[in-house]
From Swiss-Prot:
It is found in: Lysosome. It catalyses: Hydrolysis of the 6-sulfate groups of the N-acetyl-D-galactosamine 6-sulfate units of chondroitin sulfate and of the D-galactose 6-sulfate units of keratan sulfate. PROSITE patterns: SULFATASE_1, SULFATASE_2. Pfam families: Sulfatase, Sulfatase_C. InterPro entries: Alkaline_phosphatase_core_sf (IPR017850), GALNS (IPR035626), Sulfatase (IPR050738), Sulfatase_CS (IPR024607), Sulfatase_N (IPR000917). It is an enzyme of class 3 (hydrolase). This is N-acetylgalactosamine-6-sulfatase.
Amino acid sequence: MAAVAAATRWHLLLVLSAAGLGVTGAPQPPNILLLLMDDMGWGDLGVYGEPSRETPNLDRMAAEGMLFPSFYAANPLCSPSRAALLTGRLPIRTGFYTTNGHARNAYTPQEIVGGIPDPEHLLPELLKGAGYASKIVGKWHLGHRPQFHPLKHGFDEWFGSPNCHFGPYDNRARPNIPVYRDWEMVGRFYEEFPINLKTGESNLTQIYLQEALDFIKRQQATHHPFFLYWAIDATHAPVYASRAFLGTSQRGRYGDAVREIDDSVGRIVGLLRDLKIAGNTFVFFTSDNGAALVSAPKQGGSNGPFLCGKQTTFEGGMREPAIAWWPGHIPAGQVSHQLGSVMDLFTTSLSLAGLEPPSDRAIDGLDLLPAMLQGRLTERPIFYYRGNTLMAATLGQYKAHFWTWTNSWEEFRQGVDFCPGQNVSGVTTHSQEEHTKLPLIFHLGRDPGERFPLSFASTEYLDALRKITLVVQQHQESLVPGQPQLNVCNPAVMNWAPPGCEKLGKCLTPPESVPEKCSWPH
């Protein structure tokens, strides 16, 4: 590993030197664009086999860059996965989990009291050490209260929202969610930023696109490196698209949203080419978790051959589309079978900037540059957590399930189904089933749909079990969980009076403060 890292650093030094020198003669590190989608599935892109082939720009990105077919979210739900991307650490370490029930998914609704803890070092904070200017466009989702604001955690600019575009609300029992520019709100969803739930029309993706284009143009003129985290939420239900894209897809409204995203990515990449900075800009496209099959077929995407979707620790819940693009550096048209994670984007971005990850804490993200630049593969596990429960682990081609659960029988009988049409006897369960003594093990190469567990008596099973058990033991013995952030809710902390509401005349009166345990049903 040391030799690989040294070789990668040497290669990167040559790359940076070739990319351009600043006035002092020091090489300038590349710009970094992380494009994070919301609830987009592995099977939603043409390059991943989506039959309508309506993503020409993303497909071209893959043809000019590198595809990662085995790339994972850090959690099957939005907030924990986003915290992991920006810290390089599993959500169990940063406190993005709940202990209010066994194996419960949790996130950051308006009433959540917690958020990203101050001791965590976020990627934009660290990139400042290499002179990067940074902006987040879109969904933050790491806490609503003022102390969790993204500009307090390293970002220089923000246009977007602390949550998804849920609503509309009546502003009495629950306020509509604010949209911020930097420190202050500039309106609310369904008010200044309309979304027509009947037609699906909203101009939000175009607004987010323009924010990205304007930032890139401004930063290019400064000749300093920049970091853009473009975290839009268009494919999260309720799905929306602008008028020009509505009705243009063979896949309905969800496909319209995907087409608009594809067009937006094409325009961003086109601008990089026009400004002649494509060769000095690293771009990575992925999603925060699997497609929400519970919203399908009209409001949910495709997870391809994989089982179930968002909220579950089956492959469909956590395996993501992933494309790396860096012309002249990442060889074109390549497929990497490196097991990757959104946490790797933290470590890889630091490596691109010539920085080391913090040494005072466990970092779970790998540097993907050896895989991207040299085709080298690093063996590493993928851990699948639901709350503070380790549900499964993958090593190589083998995945072991220690617990299985989709969602409760009560919810299922009410029509909530995270695996519609995909029931696998003994695998997809509506009660929490423990397999810690004899895990269910699947070979994901032969059986990506997790339908045929290996025989407990087979040599293949025993060999895979031995290797995975060792890795899991090492992980659990050294694990120091963070203080849980997603246990306490309080209606008084919702977005009643965000900063800037006075200027707009949009301050609302909060209710009495009543802290209580958050209820997480699945």
